[in-house]
C-alpha cells in the first residue's frame, strides 16, 4: 500500500523486516522444539536463539542467485549463527511451514488492530446516537421523502452493523490465526508433530488439523471477504453522509477546518472529500476479496500461484481498512449536524410524509383500505403536481369527512407521534 494510506502500526506488521523477523522466530522456535525432542543438540538451538539474525540486503543478494526467497533467508541466517548451528536451521521443514506460520501470526496481529479500530468506531457511534436520539429528520426511501425518523436512529443502525462487523472480524481472526509445520505435503514425513504444536503454542496460533504443503486458502478468502464486508459498512456510512451534505440537503457535513480548502478554483466549496475517499477505497477491498477467492483452488498438494497475489492483497487490504476505519472514526466524531435543517426538510413536502398516518386512521375508522388509499393519494398528487395544500384538500374531501374531523386530520401531522417507539429501539442498545 502507498505510504499516503499507511498507518504506522499496521504498516510495521507488513514491513519486510518484520516479516523476516517473524520467520526467524518460527525457525528459532522450531529448533528449540527439535532440541527438546533430542533431534538436534541443545547447544545448536541455543546458538540459533542467541545469534540468529539476518541482513535484508544480503537476503536479496542471495536470492538473485537462488531465485528462492526462503532458501535465501535461511542461508543468510546461517551466516550469522555459524556452520555448526546453521545445518540445523529449517531441519525437516518446507518453505511454507515457515512462511504460512509466520503469515498466520502476522494476520492475527493485523486482525487485532482492526478489531480494536471497530470497537472504537462502535463507541463513537454510540455516543453520537445518544446525542441525537430524539432529533427528527425525514427518512428517505428510493431517495424520496418517506416518513420521519431520527438522526440518532440512523447512527444506531450503523452502530448495530459495526457490532456485526466485530463478530465477523473475530471469526475471521480465528480462521487465519493458525500455523502448520507438517512438511512437504502435510504428512510430517521428516518432522515430529510436536514441533508444530510447540511453535504454534508459543505464537498463540492454532495448529491446523490437516494441511497439504500449505494452509488452505479458504481461510484467507474468509478474511478478505470479511474485510470487504466491513469496507461495505464504511462505504454505506460515508455515502449517506455525502448525500446529507448535498447543498440542497445540508443536514450534516464533514468537519471543515479553518484553513482547509475545498477547491483550487471555487473558494466557496466545502466538499465531502474524506467520505469520498472512504467510498473509493471500499472498491479496492471488494477487488481484493475477488482475488482471494481465485486463490482457493491450487494444484494438487500445492502450487505457488497464490503467493504473488497474497503479497499484494493481504498487506494492502488490512492497511487500507485500518486507514478507512481511522477516517470514519474521525468523521463521525467531528460530524457537523444541523437539526434545524433536518426539521425544515421534514416539512418540505407540506405534510405528504404523513399520508400513511391519514390512511391508517381512515381504515381504523371503518373506511375500505383501497378506497381510502385512492382518496389520500388524490390529494397527495395534487400537492406534488399543483402545489395544493395537502391538509386543506383532505379536510375538504367529502369522503374523508365521513370518517375524520379537521382536528383528527391536524393531529396526524405531528412527527413525534410517529417516533413514539424510539426509546424502545434505543433501549436494545442500552441507550
Locations of regions flagged by a protein language model:
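A helix-coil-helix interface module used to build multimeric assemblies
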Residues: 1-182, 188, 192-198, 207, ...
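Glycine-rich cofactor/substrate-binding loops
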Residues: 1-22, 62-66, 266-431
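Short amphipathic alpha-helical segments with heptad-repeat character
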Residues: 108-115, 119, 126, 156-159, ...
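Short, well-ordered beta-strand elements within core beta-sheets of diverse protein domains
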Residues: 153, 221-229, 357-365
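Acidic, glycine-rich loop-and-beta core segments that form the ion-binding/anion-interacting portion
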Residues: 196-289
Amino acid at each position: 500500500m502507498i505510504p499516503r494510506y499507511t498507518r504506522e502500526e499496521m504498516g510495521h506488521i507488513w514491513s519486510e523486516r518484520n516479516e523476516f523477523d517473524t520467520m526467524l522466530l518460527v525457525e528459532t522456535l522450531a529448533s528449540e522444539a527439535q532440541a527438546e525432542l533430542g533431534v538436534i543438540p541443545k547447544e545448536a538451538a541455543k546458538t540459533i536463539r542467541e545469534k540468529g539474525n539476518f541482513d535484508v540486503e544480503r537476503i536479496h543478494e542471495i536470492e538473485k542467485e537462488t531465485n528462492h526467497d526462503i532458501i535465501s533467508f535461511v542461508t543468510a541466517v546461517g551466516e550469522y549463527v555459524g556452520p555448526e548451528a546453521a545445518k540445523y536451521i529449517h531441519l525437516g521443514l518446507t518453505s511454507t511451514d515457515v512462511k504460512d506460520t509466520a503469515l498466520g501470526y502476522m494476520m492475527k496481529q493485523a486482525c487485532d488492530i482492526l478489531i480494536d479500530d471497530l470497537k472504537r468506531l462502535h463507541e463513537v457511534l454510540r455516543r453520537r446516537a445518544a446525542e441525537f436520539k430524539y432529533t427528527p429528520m425525514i427518512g428517505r426511501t428510493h431517495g424520496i421523502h418517506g416518513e420521519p425518523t431520527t438522526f440518532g436512529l440512523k447512527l444506531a443502525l450503523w452502530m448495530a452493523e459495526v457490532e456485526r462487523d466485530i463478530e465477523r472480524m473475530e471469526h475471521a481472526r480465528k480462521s487465519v490465526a493458525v500455523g502448520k509445520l507438517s512438511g512437504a505435503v502435510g504428512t510430517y514425513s521428516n518432522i515430529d508433530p510436536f514441533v508444530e504444536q510447540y511453535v504454534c503454542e508459543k505464537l498463540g496460533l492454532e495448529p491446523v488439523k490437516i494441511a497439504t504443503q500449505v494452509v488452505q486458502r479458504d481461510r484467507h478468502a474468509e478474511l478478505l471477504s470479511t474485510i470487504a464486508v466491513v469496507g461495505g459498512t464504511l462505504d454505506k456510512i460515508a455515502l449517506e453522509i455525502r448525500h446529507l451534505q448535498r447543498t440542497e440537503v445540508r443536514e450534516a457535513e464533514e468537519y471543515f477546518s479553518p484553513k482547509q480548502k475545498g477547491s483550487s478554483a471555487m473558494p466557496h466549496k466545502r466538499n465531502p472529500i474524506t467520505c469520498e475517499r472512504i467510498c473509493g477505497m471500499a472498491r479496492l477491498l471488494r477487488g481484493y476479496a475477488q482475488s482471494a477467492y481465485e486463490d482457493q483452488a491450487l494444484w494438487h498438494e500445492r502450487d505457488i500461484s497464490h503467493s504473488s497475489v497474497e503479497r499484494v492483497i493481504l498487506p494492502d487490504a488490512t492497511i487500507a481498512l485500518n486507514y478507512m476505519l481511522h477516517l470514519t472514526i474521525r468523521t463521525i466524531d467531528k460530524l457537523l449536524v444541523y437539526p434545524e435543517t433536518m426539521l425544515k426538510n421534514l416539512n418540505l413536502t407540506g405534510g405528504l410524509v404523513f399520508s400513511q398516518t391519514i390512511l391508517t386512521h381512515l381504515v381504523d375508522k371503518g373506511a375500505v383500505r383501497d378506497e381510502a388509499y385512492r382518496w389520500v393519494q388524490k390529494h397527495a398528487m395534487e400537492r406534488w403536481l399543483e402545489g395544493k395544500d395537502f391538509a386543506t384538500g383532505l379536510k375538504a374531501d367529502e369522503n374523508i369527512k365521513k370518517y375524520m374531523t379537521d382536528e383528527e386530520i391536524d393531529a396526524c401531522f405531528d412527527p413525534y407521534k410517529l417516533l413514539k417507539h424510539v426509546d424502545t429501539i434505543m433501549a436494545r442498545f442500552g441507550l
